Curated annotation (Swiss-Prot):
It comes from the Bacteria. The lineage of its organism: Bacteria, Pseudomonadati, Pseudomonadota, Alphaproteobacteria, Rickettsiales. ATP binds at I18, R19, G60, K63, T64, T65, E126, D127, F128, R169, Y179, R216. It holds the Pfam family RuvB_N. DNA binds at R289, R308, R313. Its main location: cytoplasm. This is Holliday junction branch migration complex subunit RuvB. It is found in: Cytoplasm. It is an enzyme of class 3 (hydrolase). It comes from Rickettsia peacockii (strain Rustic). Its EC number is 3.6.4.-. The gene is ruvB. Keywords: ATP-binding, Cytoplasm, DNA damage, DNA recombination, DNA repair, DNA-binding, Hydrolase, Nucleotide-binding. GO terms for cellular component: cytoplasm; Holliday junction resolvase complex.
Length: 342
């Protein structure tokens, strides 16, 4: 699923020029910033490595950026890979044996590591030792390699898919949450200065309100609206051109696009608001289940348009009102039951 409001990384995002390098430059996630600052200072004062850290939460909120910031703050090299890229134990061994003291190893989508790789990672995280088997059959022997003290930073959008043994080995688990409008305005204002965009306060607020609580989306929308302003002969990005551009991009006043409307209308039209299983929705919309669960549903849940229940997905009264559709009596009953049992 690829669209302007997808929180997933895109080749066109070009975040490097505006990516913050240190904690004091990072906007939002205040409690995480404050706690990380304490943990980093404490580790440096003891001349120790920072404990292994796990960032989890919806995509586009700054997990990769924070990992790079930690690397800068502790003065180590930054090595990056992803769960799907580590196919074999040998792949992991090659990465680990090339680390130096205080290096940061960042593994994105860490929930997608296979079991064999995970089991080799456990002693590397706990004891900084790599146990590998060399040879085959009767000639096989175990070799233990001592590793330098490094910090593993894992990132995942699906905490529930992480195995308990792996999750328990992270000393610093941190959940990243959606941004509010004021925080997104700060992100946009910082970026506008670095990108030399004349962004007014009203223009910033209009973009922020429709960015689904996600900095990556806000920055993407800012670039596209800058394009509309340039072609329209406007020197600044104000509320008027922001609203014009966002309408052209089919982003409504609360940040929904055509994919969100398809999702909500399917449940409303075909199941009177639900409940309906996610597999049924995915098949009907010709989308992957993972794409719906990671790209569409988190924001709909966050703003109160969708509920996940044991029986399936249920859209709320607020969703019917936003769709300008009458609320079926059955849907109203389900919504009340869900809240009473919660």
């Amino acid at each position: 699923m690829t669209n302007i409001l997808s929180p997933e990384k895109s080749e066109n995002d070009q975040e490097l020029p505006i990516r913050p390098s240190y904690l004091q430059e990072f906007v939002g996630q205040q409690q995480i910033k404050e706690n990380l600052s304490v943990f980093i200072k404490a580790a440096k004062s003891r001349n120790e490595h920072l404990d292994h850290t796990l960032f989890y939460g919806p995509p586009g909120l700054g997990k990769t950026t924070l990992a790079k910031i930690i690397s800068n703050e502790i003065g180590g090299n930054f090595k990056s890979t992803s769960g799907p890229a580590i196919l074999k134990v040998a792949d992991l061994a090659a990465i680990l044996t090339n680390l130096e003291k205080n290096d940061v190893l960042f593994i994105d989508e860490i929930h997608r590591l296979n079991t064999a790789v995970e089991e080799v990672l456990y002693p590397a995280m706990e004891d900084f030792e790599l146990d590998i088997i060399i040879g085959e059959g009767s000639a096989a022997r175990s070799v233990k390699i001592t590793l330098p003290k490094f910090t593993l930073i894992g990132a995942t959008t699906r905490l529930g898919l992480l195995s308990n043994p792996l999750r328990d080995r992270f000393g610093i688990p941190m959940r990243l949450n959606f941004y509010n409008t004021e925080e997104l305005k700060k992100v946009l204002n910082r970026a506008s200065k670095l990108l030399d965009i004349d962004l007014t306060d009203s223009g910033s607020e209009e973009i922020a309100k429709r960015s689904r609580g996600t900095p990556r989306i806000a920055l993407r929308l800012l670039r596209r609206i800058r394009d509309f302003a340039a072609v329209d002969g406007k020197s600044r990005v104000d509320k008027e051109i922001s609203d014009f551009g966002l309408k052209r991009l089919e982003v409504d006043r609360i940040g929904l696009d055509s994919n969100d409307y398809r999702y909500l209308k399917f449940i409303a039209d075909n199941y009177n608001g639900g409940p309906v299983g996610i597999e049924t929705i995915a098949a009907a919309l010709s989308e992957q289940r993972d794409a719906l669960e990671e790209t569409i549903e988190p924001y709909l849940i966050q703003i109160g348009l969708l509920q996940r229940t044991p029986r399936g997905r249920v859209i709320t009264i607020a969703a019917f009102e936003h769709l300008k559709m009458p609320v079926p009596n059955q849907s109203h009953h389900q919504f009340n039951i869900f809240n009473e049992n919660e």
